[in-house]
Amino acid sequence: MSSIDKTMKFNFSEEPFDQDIKEILMTVHESLQEKGYNPINQIVGYLLSGDPAYIPRYNDARNLIRKVERDEVIEELVKFYLEQNRETK
């Protein structure tokens, strides 16, 4: 079996960034709303592309979101979604 056929295991370190990421996302969301943007579309655009132009400089939102890696933000979003929807099964 070639290495292309094997499933890779992706491990995140257990860092205490959960609260930081939440606070950053909430600040970025509020900044986007205040500037009249659709926050979900803009955040998704940033997470998919890595282009910080999706996030305004307003309230230092662009610098804040760049303090955490995009994969860490996605990890937190997936964990939150799964935890919230586990109970509704």
Swiss-Prot record:
This is UPF0297 protein OB2008. Signal peptide: none annotated. PANTHER family: UPF0297 PROTEIN YRZL. Belongs to the UPF0297 family. It comes from Oceanobacillus iheyensis (strain DSM 14371 / CIP 107618 / JCM 11309 / KCTC 3954 / HTE831). Pfam families: IreB. It comes from the Bacteria.
